[in-house]
A protein has these predicted regions:
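Helix-turn-helix
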Residues: 17, 21, 25-59, 63
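N-terminal intrinsically disordered/low-complexity leader segments
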Residues: 1-13, 184-221
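Amphipathic alpha-helical packing segments from all-alpha helical-bundle domains
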Residues: 119-145, 154-159, 228-240
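Amphipathic alpha-helical segments used for helix-helix packing
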Residues: 102-120, 169-180
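Amphipathic alpha-helical linker/stalk segments
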Residues: 66-90, 109-112, 126-147
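Hydrophobic alpha-helical connector segments
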Residues: 63, 77-106, 147-150, 156-160
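Residues at secondary-structure transition points
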Residues: 5-13, 55, 59, 63, ...
Length: 247
């Protein structure tokens, strides 16, 4: 290995150690605790070394932001793969979005500004467009040909995102209250039977009377910490969105 190659490899290793240390700090202490000085102390390098790899803390946050969106996009694509209709794709993506949020809280908080301000550059990353495209493609396929009045797919994407983010935020930021409500409600399933999960979605967007439990619903139960009511609301939100387009 030549000198140039060795320097490149060493630079990549230092950059990776900076990100690894930053992520460990976020996991143990939260995003507000992250600082260039603390990262430098953790990896035993000087502050100028950190700045030689990242212009500022926002540059580090941007790196995590992009990675988070790549993870989310892959989850959404996996969820919609092999589905028989756009209704099923949207339903599956809604559950995948929820699951991602609670299994990757730190990423989600950063990506969507939950408890931490997002930098302006994060709003212009190409991964945002990929996220938009993954959902909008299914929305376009869902819109009946010649529907009057015309449906704007981008507007519907914004509506879907707003509904999903709002539901996640309520449950993530007010977990204790949500748990109390769920307990008081007796943890009802979709059909009023405890433990019943998400079912398949017919053309009219309504939840069928005899739902079956799916991997998505099981993941949601374990990730959120309060099932039943949260699942009922999640399914209602997604199905109402679908019905609003197809009817």
């Amino acid at each position: 290995m030549g000198i140039t190659d060795r320097k490149i490899r060493q630079k990549e290793e230092v950059r990776a150690s900076i990100l690894d240390s930053a992520w460990e700090m976020v996991i143990t202490e939260g995003w507000p605790a992250l600082s260039i000085r603390k990262i430098a102390d953790a990896i035993e390098y000087s502050v100028p070394v950190i700045y030689s790899h990242f212009e500022n803390k926002d540059a580090i946050l941007l790196e995590f932001n992009r990675k988070g969106f790549r993870l989310l996009i892959n989850k959404l694509k996996d969820a919609k793969a092999g589905k028989q209709s756009p209704q099923e794709e949207i339903f599956a993506m809604g559950h995948a979005y929820w699951s991602f949020a609670f299994l990757n809280r730190e990423y989600y908080q950063l990506m969507f500004g939950l408890g931490i301000p997002t930098c302006e550059a994060a709003r212009r990353i190409p991964e945002m467009n990929d996220f938009n495209a993954a959902v909008t493609a299914s929305i376009k396929a869902l819109i009946p040909p010649g529907k009057v009045p015309a449906v704007d797919p981008f507007l519907k994407f914004q509506s879907f995102w707003s509904m999903m983010h709002g539901l996640v935020s309520i449950n993530m930021l007010n977990k204790a209250a949500a748990g109390e409500i769920s307990a008081a409600a007796g943890h009802p399933g979709i059909s009023g039977q405890p433990g019943q999960g998400a079912g398949t979605i017919p053309a009219n967007g309504l939840v069928p009377g005899q739902p079956r439990q799916t991997p998505e619903s099981k993941t949601m139960h374990g990730a959120s910490g309060h099932n039943g009511l949260a699942e009922l609301v999640l399914n209602d939100v997604i199905c109402s969105f679908i019905k609003g387009i197809v009817s």
